[in-house]
């Protein structure tokens, strides 16, 4: 969804991403490439981990737009890995709204695919989802 920012009048591009239990609502605003997550600097939020930051900026790097848009994120649920992957999906979806021609390169890189893997539920009679109690022959 494209909305004009009430204060500055700049276009704002929205995208929502989900992964495991994490949900990220992402806004792309024309700017200098800053990442803000839940009101904090993105580097601080993701503990200066280059893996998380690289995952998040990958869709922008694919299109060569690293320093052209600020990323504003509201992330909740899950852990840092799930949140980072959900932010990546949200950024990719927002970039598709920015320009429909962005879709094919993002699709080929797999950035528009929602990862369906989630934690498997625990079954009764087992210790965890699949871990059975130790077998005793006698």
UniProtKB/Swiss-Prot annotation:
Q: Which InterPro entries match?
A: Ribosomal_Su5_D2-typ_SF (IPR020568), Ribosomal_uS9 (IPR000754), Ribosomal_uS9_bac/plastid (IPR023035), Ribosomal_uS9_CS (IPR020574), Ribsml_uS5_D2-typ_fold_subgr (IPR014721)
Q: Give yes or no: UniProt keyword Ion transport.
A: no
User: Listed GO molecular functions?
Assistant: RNA binding; structural constituent of ribosome
**UniProt region (Disordered), positions on chain:** 99-138
**Can you supply one Gene Ontology CC term for this chain's record?**
cytosolic small ribosomal subunit
Keyword terms of this UniProt record: Ribonucleoprotein, Ribosomal protein
Q: Name one GO biological process term.
A: translation
The protein's matches in Gene3D superfamilies, at most eight in alphabetical order, are given as: 3.30.230.10
Looking up HAMAP family in the UniProt record yields:
Ribosomal_uS9_B
Query: Know the name of this protein?
Result: Small ribosomal subunit protein uS9
**Species per Swiss-Prot/TrEMBL record:** Nostoc punctiforme (strain ATCC 29133 / PCC 73102)
Gene name of this polypeptide: rpsI
């Amino acid at each position: 969804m494209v909305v004009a920012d009430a204060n500055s009048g700049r276009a704002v591009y929205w995208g929502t991403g989900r992964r495991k239990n994490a949900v990220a609502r992402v806004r792309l605003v024309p700017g200098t490439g800053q990442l803000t997550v839940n009101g904090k600097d993105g580097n601080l939020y993701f503990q200066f981990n280059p893996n998380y930051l690289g995952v998040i900026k990958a869709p922008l790097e694919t299109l060569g737009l690293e320093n052209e848009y600020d990323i504003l994120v509201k992330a909740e649920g899950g852990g840092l890995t799930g949140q980072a992957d959900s932010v990546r999906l949200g950024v990719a979806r927002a970039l598709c709204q920015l320009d429909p021609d962005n879709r094919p390169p993002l699709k080929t890189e797999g950035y528009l695919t929602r990862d369906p893997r989630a934690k498997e539920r625990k079954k009764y009679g087992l210790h965890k989802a699949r871990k059975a109690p130790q077998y005793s022959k006698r």
